[in-house]
């Protein structure tokens, strides 16, 4: 077996054990034993790190847990809109256990793809992006709306959000992205797609490549064609929902 294959198998086994640990927050060992079809003692040894499953068993465990721990259902339960029709993401970005599951989902979705940086716009996408960058073992880059004192050079992208007359700038330190970087753009929600397009242009200005985009929620579908116009990277959305009409301000 090649070293690369052994490392890949080891990462998959560890990822499966992490998913099993997450499942322990929802199910008892007895329940998991019945669901997975393995003795409680075996599952306990996996969770405690005493032993790792074989790759075949890890794949079976992973597939089974993915079926019962449907991430989109958990996200759907946390969807909130205020009286004016604005999306409230508080229950998404503050739930670290949910974000850990989303990280697991993202790792599976982009398995085998080269990723050297994770890029997010401040601020709501940062919790998910930070956890995902840590799991992937790559650098985290944050695009901010203000220039930071102490940073000499920036890559700047200006965009105008739809239905507004406001110009928004995003700044990334020029040395944060390098030529040849493979960048995963991460956010909690994709709504109009304009933030993701601005981030894509920042990556392009750095002569790097957008490997993909990942978000917990996709609002409507208008953003899809907009993003496709600037990049043909894969876009992974956990839950797609329709937009709620905004209340008119009298």
Task: Go through the PLM ranges and name each one.
Residues 2-4, 9-12, 201-250:
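PRPP-dependent phosphoribosyltransferase catalytic core
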Residues 115-122:
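Short glycine-rich phosphate-binding loop at a beta-alpha junction
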Residues 185-205, 209-211:
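Active-site/ligand-binding-proximal alpha/beta "capping" segment
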Residues 6-26, 30-31, 47-114:
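Active-site-facing substrate-recognition patch
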Residues 34:
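Alpha-helical residues within the helix-turn-helix
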Residues 138-183:
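Short, glycine/charge-rich flexible loops or terminal/linker lids adjacent to PRPP-binding catalytic cores
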């Amino acid at each position: 077996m090649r070293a690369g294959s052994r490392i890949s198998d080891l990462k998959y086994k560890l990822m499966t054990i992490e998913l099993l640990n997450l499942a322990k927050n929802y199910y008892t060992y007895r329940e998991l034993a019945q669901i997975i079809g393995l003795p409680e003692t075996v599952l306990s040894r996996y969770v405690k790190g005493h032993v790792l499953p074989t790759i075949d068993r890890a794949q079976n465990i992973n597939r089974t847990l993915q079926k019962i721990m449907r991430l989109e259902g958990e996200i759907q339960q946390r969807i909130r809109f205020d009286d004016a029709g604005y999306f409230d993401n508080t229950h998404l970005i503050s739930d670290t256990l949910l974000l850990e599951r989303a990280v697991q989902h993202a790792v599976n979705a982009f398995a085998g793809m080269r990723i050297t940086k994770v890029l997010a716009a401040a601020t709501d996408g940062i919790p998910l992006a930070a956890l995902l960058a840590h799991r992937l073992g790559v650098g985290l880059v944050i695009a901010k709306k203000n220039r930071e004192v102490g940073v000499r050079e920036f890559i700047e992208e200006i965009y105008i959000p739809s239905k507004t007359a406001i110009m928004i700038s995003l700044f990334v330190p020029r040395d944060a992205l390098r030529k040849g970087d493979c960048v995963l753009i991460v956010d909690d929600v994709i709504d109009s797609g304009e933030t993701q397009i601005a981030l894509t242009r920042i990556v392009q200005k750095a002569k790097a490549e957008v490997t993909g985009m990942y978000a917990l929620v996709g609002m409507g579908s208008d953003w899809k064609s907009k993003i496709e116009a600037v990049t043909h990277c894969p876009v992974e959305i956990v839950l797609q929902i329709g937009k709620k009409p905004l209340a008119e301000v009298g």
